Amino acid sequence: MASPAFAVNGMFTPVKLSGSFTASMPVDSKPAASATGVRMVVDPLQRKYQSIGKIGVDYSRPKKLATYVRSGYSVGMEFPNTPSMAGHYSLTDCDKAGGAAKILMKYDEYCAKGMLQVGKRAACRTGVYTTKCTEGTQPQMAFDVRVFNRTQAFRQAQKPVAARLREQYEARKACFVLAHNCSREEAQFKEMPMSCATFLASKMEATGACYRTVRPTSVAEDYMAGSVRAQLYTKLNPKGVYGVGACEDGHAKGDADQRRVIALASEYRAAAQSPSTVTGQQYKSAQLATQLFAHDCHHEQEQIYEYPAVAAAMCRY
């Protein structure tokens, strides 16, 4: 008997029986479904040459949106390595910025780093430190200066809100003057305070408009440049006591003496520059001082171009 007489098609699952005493029963041609689902088999050669991100992917599962999870703060601000990049986004009590604000903050940081890199490339075109390098001209001096810059950046962020806002407004005003009536640059400087301060610092370094490198050539010029620097120090410290982040000579024991030695060494080495470099720094200092501080005054312009060291002292940032 091939099958039970009372059996109905589909009522029971046919079972394949094979042996010496039983005949072979008919088997359903439809394959049974796997409990674990269907997986795509990847060829070994394909697995060897495909990207790392595709290995071990379960292709049987549907693809979901936003399944990639990145650990950490995706658009967090890095620790500033220069004082010009510090203290711009900590002016409020709220430390949780919105999504768009975080992206714009990171974009401002990216632009500021690019401006700083461009300025350093202009200052050292051949990739070798010159006599006017701000990071040092002796072994291990660059490391000490970088540590000092990071410390100064940390203290810059601790300044009062009023002091930091005043510095931001002054930097924005100077950048507007140097933008040459370009609406695109003015819009960028208006919305990006970190780019403003870094643009000024990198421009002064690239052009050499610094009182450390532009040396006075007469007693009168030396006296006037010293008077300008004294006025700037009085503006930073009206009470005669260095505040948090205001002192540029040091913040720990021994820093002040080391910074003064570095300053005197830079002034001494500035005299070893080529005549064309010295003339270019004097001209750039006078040009920037005329644009930023002369106020279309003929008398001030004559003094600035006659005494380049005074112009360099006015341009210090």
Swiss-Prot record:
One GO biological process term is: photosynthesis
Summarize subunit and interaction data from the UniProt record for this chain: Heteromer of 1 alpha, 1 beta and 2 gamma chains.
Principal location class: plastid
The UniProt entry's GO CC annotations, sorted and at most eight, read: chloroplast thylakoid membrane; phycobilisome
Q: Which UniProt keywords apply?
A: Antenna complex, Bile pigment, Chloroplast, Chromophore, Electron transport, Membrane, Photosynthesis, Phycobilisome, Plastid, Thylakoid, Transit peptide, Transport
Q: Which residues bind phycourobilin 3?
A: C297
| Lineage of origin | Eukaryota, Rhodophyta, Florideophyceae, Rhodymeniophycidae, Ceramiales
Keyword Electron transport belongs to the record: yes
Localization, per the record, is: Plastid, Chloroplast thylakoid membrane
Please verify whether the record's keywords include Chloroplast: yes
Tell me, what does this protein do in biology?
A: Critical for the incorporation of phycoerythrin in the phycobilisome complex.
Residues binding (2R,3E)-phycoerythrobilin are C210
What topology does the record note for this protein and the membrane?
A: Peripheral membrane protein
Q: Where does phycourobilin 1 bind?
A: C94
| The name this protein goes by in its record | R-phycoerythrin gamma chain, chloroplastic
Q: Where is the transit peptide?
A: 1-40
Share the record's PTM remark: Contains four covalently linked bilin chromophores.
Q: In which residues is phycourobilin 2 bound?
A: C133
